[in-house]
Amino acid sequence: KVGDFVYLFTNKGILYNETTYKGDKEKIIPLVNDEKIPSGCIYVQNHANSEFIAVSVNVKKPTEIVDQMMVMNASVNVYMGTDAIYLYSTEYKKEKAYTNITKFQYNDGYMSGVASKTVKGEITDVFAISESNNILRVLTTEWDEQSKNRLYMLDDKMQILGKLSGIADGEEIYAARYIGNIAYFITYHNTDPLFAVDISDPETPKVIGELKITGFSDYLHPYGK
């Protein structure tokens, strides 16, 4: 819920017989409030095997739909920022993982597409993606002969402002948090390293601290200062 508006997200996998259906196309368009989603509100992406539907409702008029959209894509995760909705999914090309991110703006219940971006690696923790001051911060792990970790800083048009790589190569990001202008994340090893990255300048993120923590960690939680 943002202000007077509630945003509802649903996701449904597409069955094989639906992808080969040759009958009346109108019969397979999902319904919102017993009405078909308008064609102008449907986005189709590559490798579509699921239907993501977003609906907004004004709590002062709960029986009316303010806006709706359907995105045909791969199975997605959702991150909701202060004024944008981000859908992200993993795609494999030649045995390498990539993350596709699509941005939709929202305001007073209305939603519209902005841009998409593909970055190397996979988002391995729900807290590894975060938006602040119109900057999207994304931590990924790429598996290859030796795994690689990267931090991407994307502007409001989904263009890469800055990038940090070469962080704990050979390991995988297990947990992440963004607190103020610092990105914290833990990579997996017998002794888990905790990294702190200064992201105050989105064009030049830099590692400012590293701490070895004995044991296994897959969650970071902020506690005061």
Name these PLM-found stretches.
Residues 1-225:
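Beta-sheet-rich non-transmembrane sensory/scaffold domains
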